[in-house]
Regions:
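C-terminal alpha-helical interaction appendages
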Residues: 1-73
C-alpha cells in the first residue's frame, strides 16, 4: 500500500467537496444563489487559508469551515 499524504500538489482534490457543502449552507442561510455563495467563499480569507496545505484547515469538515467563514464576515 502506498503512503498517501495530503500535499500542496494534491490538496486541490479534496477542496471542491468541502467548498460545495459550505456554499449550500451559505446560500440557504443568506438567501443567495450557489454561484454568489461560491464567489464569496472563494474571495474569503478562510478559503485563502484552506487552500494552503500548511494551514492544516483541510482537516476540518465543511461545518467547521463554514463557522470560520461566518466569524470572518
Amino acid at each position: 500500500m502506498r503512503d498517501r499524504k495530503i500535499t500542496q500538489e494534491n490538496l486541490y482534490l479534496i477542496l471542491p467537496g468541502k467548498v460545495s457543502r459550505m456554499a449550500v449552507m451559505y446560500a440557504e442561510n443568506f438567501g443567495v444563489t450557489i454561484s454568489e455563495a461560491l464567489k464569496r467563499i472563494y474571495n474569503s480569507a478562510t478559503y485563502r487559508k484552506l487552500e494552503r496545505e500548511d494551514s492544516k484547515l483541510w482537516h476540518y469538515g465543511p461545518v467547521a469551515l463554514y463557522e470560520m467563514l461566518l466569524e470572518e464576515l
